[in-house]
Amino acid sequence: LYSDRKVVDNVNLNVKKGEVVGISGLMGAGRTELAMSLFGKSYGSNISGELYINGKKVQLNTVQEAIKNHLAYVTEDRKGNGLILSNPIKINTTLANLDAISRHTVIDKDKEYNVAVDYKNKLNTKCPTVEQNVGNLSGGNQQKVLLAKWMFTDPDILILDEPTRGIDVGAKYEIYCIINQLVAEGKSVIMISSELPEILG
C-alpha cells in the first residue's frame, strides 16, 4: 500500500561474538523489517547499506546467501512462516539445512531422524517421538523446534524475532537458557522483543 514509505532509516548496528543485542519498540516500528532486510533482503525492495561479518563486507541478496554466511532468522510468526505444522518434527528440524542430511538430493532418513532426536534432547522438547506433527505441540515446544531448525544450520549470528511470544513462563525460561547457551558458545544474538524487561535481561 505504501511501497515508497521508508520503514527503517539510518541505522547502525554492531554485534560482537558472545553478545546479545536487544532491539525493542512498538508494533510497526520497523524491527522485523530491519531483521528481514539483513537476512538476505527477504523484506523490502529498496534496501541500501553495508553489512560486515568478521570484518569482511558481504552481499546477502537471498536467504540462501544469508544461510551460507552463517546467519539465521527465527521469525516471530512460527505458525505462518517458521514451521510446517502438518509435517513431523524431524522434517521441520532439518528443513533449513537439507544438504547436511542428503546425498545427491536424496534425503538420508536415518540421518534426518537422528538429527531431530539430538535436538529434541538438547533443547528438552517435550514430545513422544520426532515423528509427531509439529502442529500437535504446545507453543513452547513449537518454538524449540523452530530454534532447532536454525541451530542445525550452524549460524554465527542468530536474529530472534519475539522468541518468547505466545508461550508459557516455564517455556520462556527454557528459551532464555538456550539463548544463554548459544552466547556461551560464542554465537552473536540479535533479539527483538516488545517486552522491555526481556530486552533489559
Question: Language-model segments: what does each one mean?
Answer:
Residues 1-201:
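Glycine-rich phosphate-binding loops of nucleotide-dependent enzymes
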